[in-house]
Amino acid sequence: MTQEKKAEDLERGTDATSAVPRLWSTHCDGEVLLRLSKHGPGHETPMTIPELFQESAERFSAYPALASKNGKKWDTLTFSQYYEMCRKAAKSLIKLGLQRFQCVGILGFNSVEWVVTALGTILAGGLCVGIYATNSAEACQYVIQQANVSILIVENDQQLQKILLIPPDKMETVKAIVQYKLPLMESMANLYSWNDFMELGNDIPNIQLDRVILSQKANQCAVILYTSGTTGTPKGVLLSHDNITWTAGAMSQEMEINRVSGKQNTIVSYLPLSHIAAQLTDIWIPIKIGALTFFAQPDALRGTLVYTLQEVKPTLFMGVPRIWEKMQDTIKENVARSSRLRKKAFAWAKMLGLKVNTKRMLGKRDIPMNYRMAKALVFAKVRTSLGLDNCHAFFSSASPLSQDVSEFFLSLDIPIGEIYGMSECSGPHTVSNKSVYRVLSCGKVLSGCKNMLYNQNKEGVGEVCMWGRHVFMGYLNKEEATLEALDENGWLHSGDIGRLDSHDFLYITGRIKEILITAGGENVSPIPIETLVKEKIPIISHAMLVGDKAKFLCMLLTLKCETDRKSGEPLNKLSVEAKSFCQMLGSQATTVSDILKSRDQVVYTAIQYGIDIVNQQAMSDSHRIRKWIILEKDFSIQGGELGPTSKLKRSVITQKYKAQIDSMYLS
């Protein structure tokens, strides 16, 4: 019986042979049935990661693969050097006692060492486990224990000290720790510097490593990704070799970026590699297409990203909504400081850009003559200021992009393609690109995959369910959770609510776990309301709706502020855009405290006016915001309110600001 027939039988809910591997497994050493299509997309020959890596190392051998900043210059590794360095790391891991299917934890910011460890681990037959650099010691302990981490790779002394806070009896599986950035401040048994670690395996023969590589199968686990825990305890998502290699190939096709032809594609790595979106775009797709990955500075998200972009000028750029929002703020601030003539030119070009690109979106290609002028006078300069002048593909993932941000960049000739998915589907499920694009849509289903809307209502809105070679193996050691995510026919239930239009574009309208159910039994999806509030009130940074089991809805608001460049913490000082908003109203406020202490009348009135506009668009009275409160500090990753990709951690926020929430319902 062929793999295609077995997968087809299981999709129908039947199993023709009892000995067939299941579509799921919760064990590190488990094997699953691959979801091969009968023909076309999804029918490609399965490959292991080592097979893909070796093929690319041979094909792109002399091309630069990785680049990291060393003072004022960039040090690069070719694909050939990259592959050999990963083999060297693999031998050292074997020397340290790494066995098949044992886990190697990586704790630190994106770097050559991070990626080499990940690939070295997989070549050595182990499983790569990324740990978010922002994790607390307790969160690190959870991952180490749950995955039985065998070897731990940490970035620097700061991360090492975090690990040393974990009680030794909770680290019994850890055989060794490697620190990949100097200086090495501690001296202890089984602690190695990166250079010493890389020399450990010199006496391991090539044939020993090759045997391990040849023993690997495409339907076995290669990577474990931990969910960010925005809706509960993090779970270890098991991804197979085929999940990774097939999805990287499918995405390079959908993103319209192929193997090297003429100019090499370049990417800037700055989003945490522990997240599937970054791992796919910064490691796996570049290996597939022969792209060059530049590593940004560790403080990229605290303001230095734009300098790296201006220097590197990537051809592909992936952002999360918060990054695009900050870029929008920067552009607006620059325009606000410009002359009256430049402001007029900017407004004219934006209006023309939105008109032309909206037509393009619908398949119309007629471009007016003055569009070239707008491109030269405005669009090209905006791209250059962002470091995106060589960029031909722009993407956003991790959470929905607002209509305001999407149309703002579309009007500047920067169409941002949304990618929708989750860790459990190896990253993407639907993709938008410049050829397949609609504002507010996250595109069409990845070729070779299937989509189902489960339990649809009369408007055609239902839970998004997925089938394809991108669907994960299961959750590590969590059978019950795995069987909640995968139904009896193998469909992955996303927990997201969406609808399809007549052209098969997917629109996500909410998330089941985030829906608020009022005391009157009304279901309210918070994201559309929160997004509208941020669009209507320019001073608002974050908005979070509350009111589960309550008589009415309330909202927590934070204001746009400056950020501490070193710590990433939001400051009390208002951002340039926020100050401009206040000045336009006649307020002299320059800090959040100024607004809160005096309960600045004009600012509060303006916010209420924006809330009133949002309420006018409410579906019913139960969807209206009755009360709101401004918090003293903006949300941040460091403060615990945001996840690694800047998603709201609703349960954390609800608990942290319980007193403020209670005050709205008691007053």
Swiss-Prot record:
Testis- and brainstem-specific. Expressed in pubertal and adult testis. Enriched in germ cells and Sertoli cells while present at a lower level in Leydig cells. Present in testicular Sertoli cells and large motoneurons in the medulla oblongata and cervical spinal cord (at protein level). It catalyses: a long-chain fatty acid + ATP + CoA = a long-chain fatty acyl-CoA + AMP + diphosphate; (5Z,8Z,11Z,14Z)-eicosatetraenoate + ATP + CoA = (5Z,8Z,11Z,14Z)-eicosatetraenoyl-CoA + AMP + diphosphate; hexadecanoate + ATP + CoA = hexadecanoyl-CoA + AMP + diphosphate; (9Z)-octadecenoate + ATP + CoA = (9Z)-octadecenoyl-CoA + AMP + diphosphate. PROSITE patterns: AMP_BINDING. ATP binds at residues 227-235, 418-423, 496, 511, 624. Its main location: cytoplasm. InterPro entries: AMP-binding_CS, AMP-dep_synth/lig_dom, ANL_N_sf. The lineage of its organism: Eukaryota, Metazoa, Chordata, Craniata, Vertebrata. The gene is Acsbg2. Belongs to the ATP-dependent AMP-binding enzyme family. Bubblegum subfamily. GO terms for cellular component: cytoplasm; cytosol; membrane; mitochondrion. The keyword Transmembrane does not apply. This is Long-chain-fatty-acid--CoA ligase ACSBG2. It comes from the Eukaryota. Keywords: ATP-binding, Cytoplasm, Developmental protein, Differentiation, Fatty acid metabolism, Ligase, Lipid metabolism, Membrane, Nucleotide-binding, Spermatogenesis. GO terms for biological process: cell differentiation; fatty acid beta-oxidation; fatty acid metabolic process; spermatogenesis. It comes from Mus musculus. It is a peripheral membrane protein. It is found in: Cytoplasm; Membrane. One of its GO terms (molecular function) is long-chain fatty acid-CoA ligase activity.
